[in-house]
Amino acid sequence: MRRLLFATLLFPVAAAAQDHSMHDMPAQPAPAPQEAPVDHSMHDMPAQPAPAPQEAAMDHSMHDMAAMPGMGANAVGGSGSALLPAAEGAMRGFHATTTGNWMLMAHGVLTGVYTDQGGPRGDDMAVVQSMAMLSASRPIAEYARIEFRAMLSLEPAMGRRGYPNLFATGETANGRPLVDRQHPHDLFMELSARADVDIAPGTSLFLYGGPVAEPALGPSAFMHRRSARYLPLSPIGHHWFDSTHITYGVVTAGAKTDAFQFEGSAFKGREPDEARWNIDTPRLDSWSVRATWTPSPHWTAQISHGRLKEPEVQHPGEDEARTTASLHYARGGLSAMLGFSAKNRLPGDTLTAWVGEANWDLSRHHSLFGRIENVANDELFPDHADPLHDRLFRITRFEAGYAHRIPLGKAAELALGGSLAAYAKPAALDAAYGKAPISGTLFARLALGQ
């Protein structure tokens, strides 16, 4: 019988009596019966606390997130400057309003994962995935706001080779290509700042970037999408859609209305190197543009194009022209995404990928999720002596799973679940991968917020 390992996760939740609900505000002492209620509209900043000995008490309201840069009536912020449907809800976590009108937010995810990837080229492994995000935002003028963001991960501790993930490619470890494995994230996933200035009712300009940030290319990264919330492993199409979500050197400028956002970025095209604990030298040698349409709180669509200078160390001298399009939907407990990407190696072939994924919260405790991917990959056999070296194969991956959610107060959650994955592939791969490999994954996901 195969060994099954779950990490025991302990997460301190301070001040358990505090209310972090998206809808329930902590009761405030009213100075008079006729006092007007606080306005939490999308356009008003949080009201100043009345002078009192309790003035410094922290406000843990989830509605205050609406005042953060990048949000509007129809959209909320995803990763970088990307947008998602407002019906997904703002990112949740621990919030506090301090003196100086700074709004602080802390959000984190710690996931113990055991995966058994099937077939002759599969492997099994237990790993811990992690992400912690801190942000601070405040108004700097009547019509201007600023935000600072930091996102960190301890995944480099799992080693350069990462974890098994059948048909995943695109990185190296110890100078050798990683095949059928997913690399760990860097320690520094984001160190960025953003400034927004309102120029007309419902219209603003923004500037975003930093030494570690995300350019305006592709959809919101998979770990920030509600449609991928409980999917335990990275998508095998990661290098088609959101491989730029950790980029060393980004400057983005854009304009936003309630229905549209247009933006352009200058950034470093080369993906992070194998040294995951440090910050690579920032550079601005690549560019991208993105247009996003948010017609209602339930729909978001984006199309983007970028020119990346030598993004992958495995393909020296090759630039990449990448085009992506995605459609996102959210209503009630359902979040879904459909995406397409084409990366054209210059010089070289154009490789395309499709992805469809969804998460459905059936109730407060039960969720179903799934993802279907179809990618054209020519990196499965890096050995030049292999007869299948540089051959292009189209792979389809089907994954579905279930999560049992256990609320821990109003701002934390433990989710226990698992998924199964099957694959459709050309017969030429049977000798290497087996005729019908099946992969299984179990996870325990502890989240502060989201």
Predicted region positions:
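Transmembrane beta-strands of outer-membrane beta-barrel pores
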Residues: L110-G118, L152-M158, P211-P215, T257-A259, ...
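Outer membrane beta-barrel transmembrane domains
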Residues: S304-Q314, S335-G348, T352-N359, H365-G409, ...
